[in-house]
Amino acid sequence: MELKYVANEKDNERTVKSILKNELGISLSMLKRLKHESGPDSGIYVNSQPVYVNYKVKPGDVVLVRMNFDDNCDDIVPENIKIDILYEDEYLIVINKAANMVVHPVAMHQSGTLANAITYHLAQKGINIKVRPVTRLDKDTSGVIVFAKNPYIQNALSVQMSNKSFLKEYIGIVWGTINEDRGTINLPIERKPNSIMLRHISETGKPSITNYEVIKRYEYATLLKFSLETGRTHQIRVHCQAINHPIMGDTLYWKWVYAIDLFIQKYSLCFPDEIERYKITEKQCYENQSLENQCSDEYLFNIYKHVNSMLIQRQALHSYKVRFLHPIKKSELEIIAPLHDDMKKALEILENK
C-alpha cells in the first residue's frame, strides 16, 4: 500500500514525521515500524530516496510511504456463514450484522463469529489477511459494522471516531412513551463491581452521552433514533434503562415499567405457571395495579421475558447508519443497514395493537 504527499510552500523545512502524522494519518506505532525499513515494499521516501523521519522537506518534494502489512489470519478459522455485505473495496468491508452473532472470536465463542465469516469470504478471493473491527456491536444488536483490511485503515477510522467526525446512528424500540421529541442522556457509566459484563450508572464512571430523537410513538412503546457522543460498552442500553425506558427485549438491562402492565391488562395476557408458582391470583395481576408492587423480582423477570418474546426475541436495537471519510479515496461514505425482519415484525405488532 502506498501513500503520497506533495509538499507545498507552507511545508518548507517541515519534518517528514510531522507530515506522516498530521497529513497522512500514520500513527506513532506505525511510524516506529517504518522508521528503519527501506526496500521495494516498505519504507519512507522523498523524491524516491529513502529518508529518516527527521528529514526536512522543501516545496515540491514528493513524500512517499510504502507499507507492507504482512499479517495473515491464521488464528481465525474460515467458516462458510452467510453475510450481508453493504460495501467492500480493497481497504474495508461493511456488513449488516445479524443478531445472535458475536463479532470476533473470544474465549466462549471461538467459531460462528462475523470474523470467521468474513475470513471465509476473503479466502474465496484468494485473500489471506487479518480483518480488524473498526466498530463493534453486542451479540444481539444487529446492523452496520465496519471492518478494516489493514492497520492503517483501522487507525485512520479510529482517529475519525476520536474527533467525532465518524457518525454512527442506531434505531431502537423502548418500552413506554417518550414525550419529548428529542433529548440527551448525560450519565457516567462504569463496569459494575464483581461483574465482567454488566455496566451501570455511577458518579465515578466515564462520561457517557447519548442523544435520541423520536421517530414514532406507539401506545406502549417509542421508536427512537440514537446518536452517540461517546462509545461506552452497552451505552444505549444502560442509558435507556436509567431513564425508565428499557430497550424492548433486553433481558440484561431490563426494568419493569408501567407500559408493560398496560400491555398485559389490555390484552388479558395470562401466565398460569408463574401465578401458581408464586401464589399470585389472576385478579391481582389484572386489577390495574403494577405487578412491580406485588410480585418478586424473579416473577417479574419471567413475565418480562415472556411479554418481550411476544414482540421480539432479542434487544430491539439496530445499528442503522455510518458516515465517514474514506481514508484513501477521500470521499464521504454513508452506508445504511435496513432493519431486520424481527424488528419490522415487532413494529407491525405495535402498529396493529
Predicted regions and their residues:
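Short beta-strand segments enriched for Tyr within beta-sheet-rich domains
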Residues: 157, 232-240
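Short histidine-centered loop motifs in beta-beta connectors
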Residues: 50, 213, 219-227
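Short coil-to-beta-strand transition motifs
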Residues: 76-80, 201-210, 316-317
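Active-site lining segments that contact anionic ligands and/or coordinate catalytic metals
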Residues: 209, 221-223, 233-235, 317-319
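RNA pseudouridine synthases
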Residues: 1-195, 209, 338-351
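Short Gly/Pro-enriched turn/cap motifs at secondary-structure boundaries
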Residues: 135-136, 201-204, 310-314
